[in-house]
Amino acid sequence: MSTENDVAQIEEARIPGNYSARKIQRWNPSSIYATNIIHNNVKSNVKSNDAIHKNLPVNHVSPAQMYSTDSGRMFHAGSICIIMVGLPGRGKTNLSISLCRYLRWLGVRTELFHLGDYRRKNTDLNKETDLNFDKLNSNSYFSLQPENSNIKNLKSKIKSELIDDIISFFETSNGQIAIYDAINGLSSERKKLLDFFKSKNIKCLFIESIIDDVELLNENIRDAVNSPDYKSWDSEAALENFTNRIKANEAYYEHLDSKRANLPFIQSYNFGEKILINDLKHDFLTTKIIYYLLNAKIKCHSIYFARCSLNKLKFKDDPPITENGKVYINKIYNTLASSFTDKKIPKGLVVWTSTRLRTIQSSQIFKNAGCTVRHRPELTQLNPGAAEGLTDQELDEKFHESYVKHLSDPYHHRYPRAESYHDLALKIEPLILEMEKLSHDVLIIADETIIRIFYGYLMASNANDIPLIEFPQNEIIKITYHTYNNEIENLVVDGIAKE
């Protein structure tokens, strides 16, 4: 039985005629922005930067979050520290950021703690001493067993600072999952971490990233030299230095092994090719993490979004594409083709559309170019229900109580017989996991309501912001995966007027 501290207060829904409405109110009033009034929040086509590294505000609500609690913790899972394990160049940072993005999407208050960030901060403060970064690269700092006593003390200081911040996150920020991103390559150190967090009533889950595919490893090492450590380095010098880091750790590194120390762990081989699990309780949240790891891939490609033509039709209408629609999709095709180096649409591009006739016909030009085209019913636009075609004034007159609720929470609210953005987010989750599994560029041709949901995932948006973002029909939105964050670019479509 849940306590008052675990579960939000509930009340009966008061939206008459909404046959798909749930029977309880699952959101604390404090978790919804009081200022989220459409009259005071003009929609904008200004897209924010990736928010994955930003600390979550207390009132943050995630797009696929099922409910809110006073404690901030979900699924009765308690506090968990995910401790990454792996040699340099094994994609730990990539994996930890991707996992953080997915967990936040689910509404789990998750923060990233990169040991490299703490090292860079501390060494920047000591540029005039023998502890500057150039000095670190010429001695034993990056070894698991440094011989220099100053280096040992510095590493201990940096780790203590990180651990203190993790504890603060749990105790003062309603945190639920902390992801500790570091090599953590010694069995003895991992046991100390387990015992320490256990004393604080924090569960540990160790995730080791192992790459034994030579081609994948080399690709990941090349990507690793783009880290902040090598911001102004020559690429060849950076590659040599990073390779030396790997060698400095290989001699001492100890894989997770149930015989050596029976820890709760997951070993991921080649980013989801094979998963080994040891001593885990298969609760809901752990199962979601395992399932995500089976789908996660090292990503360096792009996701493109284009509005479909004639997307202002009534929800139930499904006419064929018009001549104007054909002109529009040709311009989309040409603009996208011109953005590639060889000015051609790559055959590896995967195109997703809904199952509506006009979107199927719109994708034909890409199919003719050799692209893989997939039609997904989940990509059908938001169903406006009884609110379809009504002005704000008409909505206020006909559904006054519902209209007031919509103004205060446009993300979760449904009009009678309608869908909410939250419904779309839950419906699209399987496609998000499928998207995570792909290694090729993807073009999604969809209604603006669908694009908002995908954007919210890829840029770690707050749910309250999603209904307010506009994606003009004369732009293709390009979001590119990078190790540390996703980057957005707008490709303007010539010959299409801005709405």
What are the functions of these language-model segments?
Residues 93-167, 384:
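Conserved substrate/cofactor phosphate-moiety recognition/catalytic segment
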Residues 78, 122, 136-212, 439-440:
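Glycine-rich phosphate-binding loop used to anchor ATP phosphates in small-molecule kinases
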Residues 226-294:
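Small-molecule kinase domains that catalyze NTP-dependent phosphoryl transfer to phosphate-bearing small molecules
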Residues 52, 299-371, 398, 419-421, ...:
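Active-site-proximal alpha-helix that buttresses catalytic centers in soluble enzyme cores
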Residues 130-143, 216-232, 312-314, 320, ...:
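Phosphate-handling substructures
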Residues 141-150, 197-255:
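A glycine- and Lys/Arg-enriched "phosphate-lid" helix/loop adjacent to the NTP-binding pocket
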Residues 2-60:
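Charged, amphipathic alpha-helical linker segments immediately N-terminal to NTP-binding catalytic cores
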Residues 3-15, 53-73, 257-258, 274-302, ...:
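Acidic, low-complexity terminal tails and accessory targeting/binding regions
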